[in-house]
């Protein structure tokens, strides 16, 4: 599992891959280590789709990454308390599932006029909106198999969240998932779940915008 929080404590990501997701997995005991996400991401992106990636930790506390047959990297580990950060325990009132392509399009549509996405749900529909100096946009989806594949709302809920953070995680996950599942309650952190094929899942938590 991998867990990381941004410096401003606005976003938290929690990734869980079972050992069955790997071709080969060996771990003699619990090990905690920290890496710089920006550096680690750049390194992993050097791999082609056909490349195998092997990750080890050396005796001198270095992360060893082998890409394919001829690329070998060493990365210095860092002290990190992110893995000890407890996950938010929130009783969510609303849950919606949207195809990843539709969710990406919604973010792009709202970003034309706003830096924030407001999400509202009732028992039968989800509403995505944004407002800025140049104008406003409102997008309503009703449950159907093509776009809004699931909606479950115990009570009407609404929350406003940063598009900068949302766009970053959607671009990072890319086309590896078909559906994006969002859970939230009014004025509470948003939780987005991505299920990556049959390999594992990613949970992304995002604090709501606080009106001053």
Across the structure, where does each feature detected by a protein language model lie?
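Polyanion-binding surfaces on beta-sheet-dominated domains and ring/shell assemblies
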Residues: 117
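DNA polymerase sliding clamps and clamp-related checkpoint/processivity subunits
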Residues: 1-112, 120-212
């Amino acid at each position: 599992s991998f867990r990381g929080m941004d410096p401003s404590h606005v976003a938290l990501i929690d990734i869980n891959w079972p050992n069955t997701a790997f071709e080969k997995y060996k771990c003699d005991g619990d090990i905690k280590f920290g890496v710089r996400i920006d550096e680690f991401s750049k390194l992993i992106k050097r791999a082609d789709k056909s490349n195998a990636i092997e990750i080890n930790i050396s005796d001198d506390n270095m992360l060893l990454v082998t890409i394919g047959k001829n690329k070998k990297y060493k990365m210095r580990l860092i002290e990190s308390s992110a893995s000890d950060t407890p996950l938010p325990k929130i009783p969510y009132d609303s849950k919606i599932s949207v195809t990843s392509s539709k969710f990406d399009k919604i973010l792009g549509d709202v970003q034309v006029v706003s830096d924030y996405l407001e999400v509202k749900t009732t028992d039968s529909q989800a509403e995505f909106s944004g407002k800025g100096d140049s104008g406003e946009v409102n997008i309503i989806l009703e449950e159907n198999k093509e776009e809004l594949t699931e909606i479950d709302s115990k009570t009407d809920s609404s929350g406003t969240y940063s598009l900068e953070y949302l766009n970053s995680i959607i671009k990072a996950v890319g086309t590896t998932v078909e559906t994006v599942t969002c859970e939230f309650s009014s004025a509470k952190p948003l939780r987005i779940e991505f299920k990556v094929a049959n390999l594992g899942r990613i949970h992304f938590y995002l604090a709501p915008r606080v009106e001053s």
